Amino acid sequence: MPGFQNANISDLAPPAREKTFDDTIAVKIPEDEKNTWFSWRKLWAFTGPGFLMSIAYLDPGNIESDLQAGAQAEYKLLWVLLVSHIVGMLLQRMSARLGVVSGKHMAEIAYDYYPLVPRIILWLMIEIAIVCSDMQEVIGTAIAIYLLSSGKIPLLVGVLITILDTFTFLFIDRYGIRKLEFIFVALISTMAISFGYEFVVMKPVLTKVLTGTVVPWCSGCGKEEIITAISIFGAVIMPHNFYLHSALVKSRKVDRSSKTRIAEANKYFSIESAFALSVSFFINLFVLSVFARGLYQKTNGDVNSMCLSHNDIPDSNVFPNNTSSVTVDLFQGGIYLGCQFGLFAMIIWAIGIFAAGQSSTMTGTYTGQFVMEGFVRISWPKWKRVLITRAVAITPTLILCIKAHGIKNLTGMNDFLNCVQMVQLPFALIPMITFTSSKRIMHNFRTSKPLQYFSIICGIITIGINVYFIFQYVTENFGTGWLIFVIIGPFTLLYIAFILYLAIYCLVACELMNDTVNLPGFDFHRTLELDAPWITETFVVNDVYF
């Protein structure tokens, strides 16, 4: 199969390309006079990539999953939020180590590791994930603008306004990576203050918050709560975020000729990522707890009667006057807070959503750059890449805005977009496990056998959870008729076949399958230009480098 073996995409595009990070802009790491295990100065120098990475855990899609979980299951799913952040931290640590040790990010390694056709498929899948994520962020920002303007700026205009994000990103990026990281920290702080304010005002029951966080159980939960728990997990583990994090760590100038310096970088990046994701967890906890306290076991009629006296709140009649359990999304969540605590609470909520959308769109743009640089290797000016990335995301969003006939019908797109991103997850998770387990890439920094097995198990569970969620979404929205399965059947088989294709490469990298097996369409011995400058001698005894 020629397309699956030795074809080279460099025949189609020039290999030379503009590097996002190089030695002239990479942050230098200070040298301490004293050889101490920990240095605050060094931690500060390494601080930044983890916060940019953590934005994916705070995007509008995650916020909406949080508020729906709170309204539906009260505090009972907080432990799912905690577990998903812990698993995410372990996976992000692997992604960061890959970038530090190899000196390349995931897309660049995939270009060298896989044959032509598989890597083109990988590239397209990740681009789809980026576009879907960007659509969520565009919609979230447009909703925030709608609420901040008290409904005077319609959703369609709000979507068009988000084009300015591109120019904002280009303007900030000109001043260097540290300035950009500061902006992201400011946006995360804005979210923490906004959602923290709502948490304080709502006064959740702290004992229930603590119990829901540490007790891994959901008493009295049924099918709907299980699906909600799955959506929380799926919304947190974002496929394109692994590609992003492995590239962001390259913004630090790490001496790869020194094993000590590489280990040091891995340590500080792990500490920074753990802190950033801890902040992310508490922000998500704030949102879930607010709506657990305010909307659990409430009906649409309850909220409708609350909103009758608030003429200053736009669309205060969004909740129908019936006895059905209340359903809520980003837009309705803001309206509810306005009806409960006044216009100021709605504005604070909108500011938090705006910050989430702004930060997520900029990281999505960055990810699009890295993916294009690695997979396609097209030498484009940065402004052109940014504009095209945003145009691809805005075009389908505009179409949805026109067809949705109003903001009330559009915000429910979150479940569909989360579903599409879940479909893409194996195409980031499996390659990452493969690369970090490979001796040819990581050498003596490859993940240990226990961690390999743990990550494989996590991967299988995560993919299984996502497949279950996708099945539920399809059957609930399109039914279970034979025609549906006839239509999606061929695509499902191709999807599973490609996952198995990637899984075989992963098993070979983990040495669970012999690379001497001659399988059609596989090339286990592609030449990789990954050096190991920290290794002074190149002989190996029992897989240990000396």
UniProtKB/Swiss-Prot annotation:
Topology with respect to the bilayer: Multi-pass membrane protein
Cytoplasmic side: 1-42, 92-119, 174-181, 250-270, 356-386, 437-453, 505-546
Residues modified by glycosylation: N321, N409
Pfam families for this protein: Nramp (PF01566)
Compartments it resides in: Apical cell membrane; Cytoplasmic vesicle membrane
Keywords annotated in UniProt: Cell membrane, Cytoplasmic vesicle, Glycoprotein, Ion transport, Membrane, Transmembrane, Transmembrane helix, Transport
Protein's UniProt keywords contain NADP: no
Topological domains annotated Extracellular: 64-70, 141-152, 203-228, 292-334, 408-415, 475-483
GO cellular component: apical plasma membrane; endosome membrane; intracellular organelle; plasma membrane
Tissue expression from the record: Expressed in dopaminergic neurons (at protein level). Primarily expressed in mc1, mc2 and mc3 epithelial cells of the pharynx and vpil-6 pharyngeal-intestinal valve cells displaying an anterior-posterior expression gradient. Expressed in gonad sheath cells.
Major localisation: membrane
Record's note on what induces expression: Slightly repressed by high levels of Mn(2+).
Residue stretches in coiled coil: none
Any one GO MF annotation of this record: iron ion transmembrane transporter activity
Protein task: Probable divalent metal ion transporter which regulates Mn(2+) uptake.
Family designation: Belongs to the NRAMP family.
Protein name per Swiss-Prot or TrEMBL: NRAMP-like transporter smf-2
Organism encoding this protein: Caenorhabditis elegans
Lineage, highest ranks first: Eukaryota, Metazoa, Ecdysozoa, Nematoda, Chromadorea
